[in-house]
Amino acid sequence: MQPLTLTDLDAELTDAIAEDADKATFDRIGAHVDRLDVRPAVTLHSAALWYASQGLYVFPLTPRTKVPIKGTNGCLGATDDPDMVNKWWTGQPAANIGLATGHLVDVVDIDGAEGQRSRVKMWADNFEAIDNDALAKVCTPRPGGMHIYLPATGDGNKAGIFPGIDYRGRGGYVVAPPSVNDQGAYRFFGPVNLGGLA
């Protein structure tokens, strides 16, 4: 029987990591996620405006990349001002969304199978409360990739807190849904509780 929800697929992914599954298994799980994406299409422009309306700071990234568009000053120029967001995305409607961390949200950045193995160990050993504190979870296009949005702590970025896991805080950023790259789309799964943080 095939998994029916993203929560089921998250559990299947965790099992696959524990069993050190092959790439084909991760590709199959990713294909199931793609088939379950039945939400209405949202433009990058409207998504950037929604983030800004929640008080989150955004800035445009070069289409299909995680590189800030030249002249925007990257996360240092990030804003929640709807006029600036409109100006940026009217001029570059295919621009991906950079979401500055450290202001309202921080992000645990889990990178691929190595990060997922660390996640399983991390949750079991140290951070059982992280799932309860999560404001949102994002599947990234890389197989096994995930972002977990948490309330901001005021801490800065920390690379390699565990193998395959980085912490994005003050001075950092992540690529936000529904941005895309050559491997696929960034997507929320599970509850999204980013409203009312400001």
Indicate where each model-derived feature is located.
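Signature for HUH/AEP ssDNA processing cores
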Residues: 2-11, 15-18, 23-144, 153
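Histidine-centered active-site/metal-ligand motif
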Residues: 147
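DNA replication initiation modules
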Residues: 99-116, 121, 150-198
